Amino acid sequence: MATAPRNGTLEIRPLTLSRVADVRIVLASTFGSQCWDLFFRFTDEQKRAAGIAGKMTPEHEARRKEILAKLARRKRGSAGLVAYADGEPVGYISLGPRSDYPAVERSRSMSAVDDVPVWVIPCITVRRGYRGRGVAIAMIQATVAYAAKKGAAAVEGYARPDGKRVHDGSAHMGTESMFRRAGFRRIRGVVPGLPRYYTPRVTMRATSGTKPRTSSQSRTR
C-alpha cells in the first residue's frame, strides 16, 4: 500500500486543466468518486438542467469531468487545491467564494454567520493509504494563503464537531479538531432547532490575516 513520505515534501498546487485527471485519481473509491466536486456547486434543479442528476452513467461522469475542467480554467481563482507526495496526487480540497456553492448557501446547517465575504471549504478528500499523515491539515492551511491572494477576507469550513468518532465517509467536510490544528477557530456551534436527520456541523474560520501553523514538509506554489 502506498504511503505519503514521512520526511519528504508535500506540494499543494491550484487545480488546473492539466490536474483534473489527478483529481479523478484522488476521488476514486471515495465519497466523491461520483461527485467530481460538484455536489455543493449545484442545486438539484441545476443538476437536472446540467444533465448530471440521477444515477451515475458514463455520460454523467464525462459531463461532470467537463464541468470541473471548465472550473479549472477560470481566471479569477482555482476551484480547489491538489496535494502531491513525491509527485503522486494524494489529496484534493474544494475551495471558492461562498457564492460558488448554491447548496451551501441554501443549507440551514451552514447558513451565513455574518456579511464577511468568505471563501469556503465544502469538501476535503485524501486518498486511502495517505490518511492520518497530515495531508488534510496541510491542505486546509494552504487554502488561507491562496484565498488571501485572491482577495478573500476569510476562509470557512463546516466541520463535524469533536466528540464521537466520525466514519471516513462522513468526514468529507473535515472535523473540528482538524480545522483547529490548521489554525482555524470555531465561530459558531451547531445551529439549534435543526431536524434530527441533519448532520451536525460547526462553523470554523480563519481570516486572511491569520498565520496558520505551517509544516516544514509542505509548500504551496
Q: Over which residues does each language-model region extend?
A:
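C-terminal "cap" of GNAT-fold acetyltransferases
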Residues: 169-177, 182-183, 188-221
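Conserved acetyl-CoA-binding loop-helix of GNAT-fold acetyltransferases
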Residues: 123-126, 132-149
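Active-site rim helix/loop that mediates acceptor-substrate recognition in acyltransferases
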Residues: 35-79
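Conserved acyl-donor/pantetheine-binding loop and adjacent beta-alpha core of acyl/acetyltransferases
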Residues: 37, 66-70, 74-78, 84, ...
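Conserved N-terminal entry element of GNAT/NAT acetyltransferase domains
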Residues: 1-51, 210-221
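Conserved GNAT acetyl-CoA-binding A-motif
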Residues: 140, 147-170
